[in-house]
């Protein structure tokens, strides 16, 4: 199962020493990717050999202007194999779909072919919003829909009737939409995955097998997913 895991250390208070130690642990475990904040990318690049380096972009709010987001993606693409990019959440909630489309096509295009996972922040979305956003993610050329930053605000999510953590039901719904629309997208579930049992239930719910080009699990505790 570890070959499907994106090991993420993204808390804002983590030190360089802690993040580098995490990179060493990622290599030992043999996870799919190690995901860090952009400030640590050049340092972690020196450590990783087998494991792919992933950087988050505009994390966790998705609130920077498109030009800034694209410039950061272009710069990070010199160092990383993968990018987890937060969708422009405010624009999504404002139903400014043309602007959302323009942003994601521009930002994903700046990645130069790197694997891109667009974080849609499921806890904040209505059904109408999530399906419109999935369509735009597919059009943008991204490779994965990623469910959440793992930093969503519980109060707002509850107002919408949404869980803040990953569930098999949500994973199944994303995968079902992808299949129905014929999209060539993978699914990455992140947030609250703490046990091997949880992880297996989510993988089974997605139904894409155990292919890391189609399925990823984001967690800060990859050790518990060893099987």
Swiss-Prot record:
Keywords: Cytoplasm, Lyase, Schiff base
Known catalytic reactions: 2-deoxy-D-ribose 5-phosphate = D-glyceraldehyde 3-phosphate + acetaldehyde
Catalytic site: 84 (proton donor/acceptor), 146 (schiff-base intermediate with acetaldehyde), 188 (proton donor/acceptor)
One GO term of the biological process aspect: deoxyribonucleotide catabolic process
Lineage top rank: taxon: Archaea
Organism of this sequence: Pyrobaculum islandicum (strain DSM 4184 / JCM 9189 / GEO3)
GO molecular function terms attached to this record: deoxyribose-phosphate aldolase activity
Entry annotated with the keyword Lyase: yes
Pathway this chain belongs to: Carbohydrate degradation; 2-deoxy-D-ribose 1-phosphate degradation; D-glyceraldehyde 3-phosphate and acetaldehyde from 2-deoxy-alpha-D-ribose 1-phosphate: step 2/2
CC terms in the record's Gene Ontology section: cytoplasm
Subcellular localization: Cytoplasm
Primary role: Catalyzes a reversible aldol reaction between acetaldehyde and D-glyceraldehyde 3-phosphate to generate 2-deoxy-D-ribose 5-phosphate.
Enzyme Commission (EC) number: 4.1.2.4
Keyword Chloroplast applies: no
The protein, known as: Deoxyribose-phosphate aldolase
Enzyme superclass (EC): lyase
SMART domains per record: DeoC (SM01133)
InterPro entries: Aldolase_TIM, DeoC, DeoC/FbaB/LacD_aldolase, DeoC_typeI
């Amino acid at each position: 199962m570890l070959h499907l895991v994106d090991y993420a250390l993204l808390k804002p208070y983590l030190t360089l020493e802690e993040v580098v130690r995490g990179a060493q642990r990622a290599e030992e475990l043999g996870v799919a990717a190690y995901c860090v904040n952009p400030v640590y990318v050049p340092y972690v690049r020196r450590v990783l050999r087998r494991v792919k380096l992933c950087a988050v972009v505009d994390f966790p709010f998705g609130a920077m202007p498109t030009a800034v987001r694209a410039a950061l993606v272009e710069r990070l693409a010199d160092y990383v194999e993968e990018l987890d990019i937060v969708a422009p959440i405010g624009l999504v909630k404002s139903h400014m779909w043309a602007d959302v489309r323009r942003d994601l096509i521009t930002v994903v295009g700046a990645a130069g072919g790197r694997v891109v996972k667009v974080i849609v922040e499921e806890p904040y979305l209505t059904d109408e919003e999530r399906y419109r956003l999935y369509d735009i993610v597919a059009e943008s050329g991204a490779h994965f829909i990623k469910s959440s930053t793992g930093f969503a605000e519980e109060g707002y999510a509850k107002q919408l009737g949404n869980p803040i953590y990953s569930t098999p039901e949500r994973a199944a719904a994303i995968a079902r939409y992808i299949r129905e629309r014929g999209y060539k997208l993978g699914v990455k579930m992140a947030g609250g995955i703490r046990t091997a049992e949880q992880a297996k239930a989510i993988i089974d719910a997605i139904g894409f097998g155990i292919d890391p080009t189609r399925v990823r699990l984001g967690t800060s505790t990859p050790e518990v997913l060893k099987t």
